[in-house]
Curated annotation (Swiss-Prot):
Name of the protein described by the UniProt record: Exodeoxyribonuclease 7 large subunit
Subcellular localization: Cytoplasm
Pfam families, sorted: Exonuc_VII_L (PF02601), tRNA_anti_2 (PF13742)
GO MF annotation, one: exodeoxyribonuclease VII activity
Assembly and binders: Heterooligomer composed of large and small subunits.
Keywords: Cytoplasm, Exonuclease, Hydrolase, Nuclease
Length: 445
């Protein structure tokens, strides 16, 4: 019986063999998480599987606290672990020291972390977005020199707004060198003084589009002074460049639509503006014509002297009052001098008095010149107004051989208002003439 081993002894021996094998102390394993559970103690229990096999695994709380993501059922992971035996059950399992997402999962993890960082910095804030010019003169297009994206953008801009100059900047959009090339081309386009920049490429996997998730590329777009339209991938594709750009387009074609106005819509707007302006001008001219006709019927325009008689009288009155004021001032000064002569020695003050007289004389001359200048200005102004009013006077019009035609006390301005045998009164410069219409001839007859 001494040759038989107990279950515990065999299990301990197998565990000892596992623990002494250096190849099992640090193994790298790739697989999918299943039956994932997080214990209240903080330890993680799960299986790692592929298409053919399953291994039990656990991760102690200390190692689990160092993870930079939350593991979940179905995650594809890369593990660093040691292999040992769980004695109580007698099965082998792995004890995981490190865990990270594999492939695309890792990319999404990096993407979310960078998105959170840039969001906190304000790189995606709407307040920092620049408006896209409505009527661009120059548009820089950053994309691959071949492919559907550049063709779609080029044809759409040409059909919508051919006045815009397109500056095509061939750019690497995929591969190891694409990141630096995209940054360089964005900075170059920003230095050209264009109105809008379109950064775009066709669709692809997250790996294909990853250059537009690179932090340096996103910051180059955010720091660009020229408005940028991002058109990376298809409608369902999103990159961090879309969030940093001033506006995101679902496709390269939509980017061209956003960047340009439609020439046919503009033509319709111009035609509408032209119609509205023409209607306004016609209405304004008609209002002014009626206003002139209304003014011409005023009594004062028939007797223009009524407009300036009172002004002439007022000017004469002001002239008279000014002269009286000057004379009164002069008399006051003369009387003052006489009093001074009586109080002081005339000889001692003669020099001062002469100077005062010269000052008064100079002042008087200046006042007289000023008065004459003002009077002349008023006369010229009134003369111009009289001439303008006389030019508008019906009397002066009649002096040039014209006559005012009246029928039953109404002024006739058109042959359409006359018929044969109408009795008319013609007002001429020196009297009235009664007349009778024998025949009416219109200019278009």
């Amino acid at each position: 019986m001494s040759d038989y081993l107990s279950v515990s002894a065999l299990t301990k021996y197998i565990k000892y063999k596992f623990d002494q094998d250096p190849h099992l102390q640090s193994v790298l394993i790739k697989g999918e998480l299943s039956n994932f559970k997080k214990h209240s103690s903080g330890h993680l229990y799960f299986n790692v599987k592929d298409k053919e096999s399953v291994i039990s695994a656990m991760m102690f709380k200390g190692s689990a606290s160092k993870l930079n993501f939350e593991p979940k059922e179905g995650d594809e992971v890369l593990l660093e672990a040691r292999v040992s035996v769980f004695e109580r059950r007698g099965n082998y399992q792995i004890y995981v020291n490190k865990m990270q997402l594999d492939g695309i999962g890792n990319l999404y993890q990096k993407l979310e972390a960078l998105k959170k960082k840039l969001t906190e910095e304000g790189c995606f804030d709407k307040a920092n977005k620049k408006s896209i010019p409505k009527f661009p003169k120059k548009i820089a297009v950053l994309t691959a020199s071949t492919g559907a994206a550049i063709r779609d953008i080029h044809s759409t801009i040409n059909s919508r707004f051919p006045l815009a100059e397109q500056i095509q900047i061939s750019t690497l959009v995929q591969g190891e060198k694409a990141k630096d090339d995209i940054i360089e081309k964005i900075e170059y386009a920003d230095s050209l003084g264009v109105d809008t920049i379109i950064v775009g490429r066709g669709g692809g996997s997250i790996e294909d589009l990853w250059n537009f998730n690179e932090e340096a590329v996103v910051r180059a777009i955010y720091n660009c002074k020229t408005p940028i339209i991002s058109a990376v991938g298809h409608e369902t594709d999103f990159t961090l460049s879309d969030f940093a750009a001033d506006i995101r387009a679902a496709t390269p074609t939509q980017a061209a639509v956003i960047a340009t106005p439609d020439q046919y819509e503009l033509l319709q707007q111009i035609q509408q503006y032209q119609f509205t302006l023409t209607r306004f001008i016609k209405k304004h001219l008609e209002q002014q014509r009626k206003h002139v006709e209304h003014l011409s019927s005023y009594y004062k325009f028939k007797k223009p002297t009524l407009l300036y008689d009172q002004q002439i009288q007022r000017r004469d009155d002001l002239e008279k009052r000014l002269k009286q004021q000057i004379q009164a001032t002069f008399e006051q000064q003369r009387h003052r001098l006489m009093l001074l002569q009586q109080r002081y020695n005339l000889k001692a003050l003669l020099s001062s008095v002469n100077q005062e007289q010269q000052n008064n004389l100079q002042l008087t001359n200046q006042l007289v010149k000023l008065l004459n200048s003002k009077i002349l200005s008023y006369k010229n102004d009134l003369k111009n107004k009289v001439e303008n009013l006389n030019n508008l006077s019906p009397t002066n019009t009649m002096l040039r051989g014209y006559a005012i035609v009246n029928k039953k006390d109404e002024v006739i301005t058109s042959t359409k208002d006359l018929t044969e045998n109408d009795q008319l009164t013609l007002t001429m410069k020196d009297g009235l003439v009664d007349a009778k219409v024998t025949k009416v001839r219109c200019n278009n007859d």
